[in-house]
């Protein structure tokens, strides 16, 4: 009887605690990419040149190194910026809205998991993505980085491919000379995670995170 009870405890302990939202943090980009079999799309907010014409601050597509669509946004240090990422299953269109700008894209692959990646490469800079709500349910975790630093929040447990709405708030902060390009940025990276992490990752995909 004791052996049976122990066996049942082990089996039940291996089952998911909840069928709802599950979060975890991963330490590196290589680890994150090992969980993504195919990237469906990435919604990114980055410091850019803070609304100037030299580059962009918002982008959407399957490759941040060559995004499908971009927009300008005049980031201000310490100012909270609400955003929304929505996927409509019937039309196969994802939209990314921040600061009154809406970007649209049609993903080519299915997906079931997303990562919230925040990165600050320079001292005296920080970024935080918080207040995440998925389909009306609080995610209950945040992603934040203080320079030089990286934080990656993985979110699973919801059938995203049937359609979803994710809302949250991003705050980019700096003192002194502001950073540029992707030195202060967040990404909502959505993809199809294999049941077993891949043994190899694409160096090209990793490089796209650091342009």
Predicted regions and their residues:
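Positively charged n-region of N-terminal signal peptides that target proteins for export
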Residues: 1-4, 211
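Short, basic/polar N-terminal leader/transit segment immediately after the initiator methionine
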Residues: 3-6, 22
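Bacterial N-terminal signal peptides
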Residues: 5-14
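Sec/Tat signal peptide C-region and signal peptidase I cleavage site
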Residues: 15-19
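Mature extracellular "passenger" or substrate-interacting domains of secreted, surface-exposed proteins
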Residues: 20-194
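A short, hydrophobic C-terminal helix/tail in secreted or cell-surface proteins
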Residues: 198-210
């Amino acid at each position: 009887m004791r052996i049976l009870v122990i066996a049942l405890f082990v089996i039940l302990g291996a089952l998911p605690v909840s069928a709802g939202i599950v979060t975890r943090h991963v330490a590196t980009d290589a680890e994150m990419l090992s969980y993504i079999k195919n990237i469906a799309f990435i919604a990114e907010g980055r410091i850019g040149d803070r609304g100037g014409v030299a580059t962009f601050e918002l982008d959407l597509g399957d490759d941040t190194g060559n995004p499908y669509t971009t927009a300008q946004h005049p980031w201000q240090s310490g100012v909270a910026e609400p955003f929304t990422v929505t996927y409509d299953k019937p039309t196969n269109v994802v939209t990314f809205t921040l600061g009154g700008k809406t970007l649209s894209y049609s993903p080519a692959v299915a997906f079931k998991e997303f990562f919230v990646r925040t990165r600050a490469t320079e001292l005296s800079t920080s970024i935080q993505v918080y207040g995440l709500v998925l389909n009306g349910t609080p995610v209950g975790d945040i992603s934040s980085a203080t320079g030089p630093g990286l934080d990656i929040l993985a979110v699973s447990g919801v059938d995203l491919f049937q359609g979803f709405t994710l809302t949250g708030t991003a705050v980019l902060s700096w003192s002194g000379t502001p950073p540029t390009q992707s030195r202060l940025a967040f990404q909502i990276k959505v993809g199809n995670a294999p049941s077993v992490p891949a043994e190899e990752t694409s160096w090209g995909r990793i490089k796209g995170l650091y342009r």
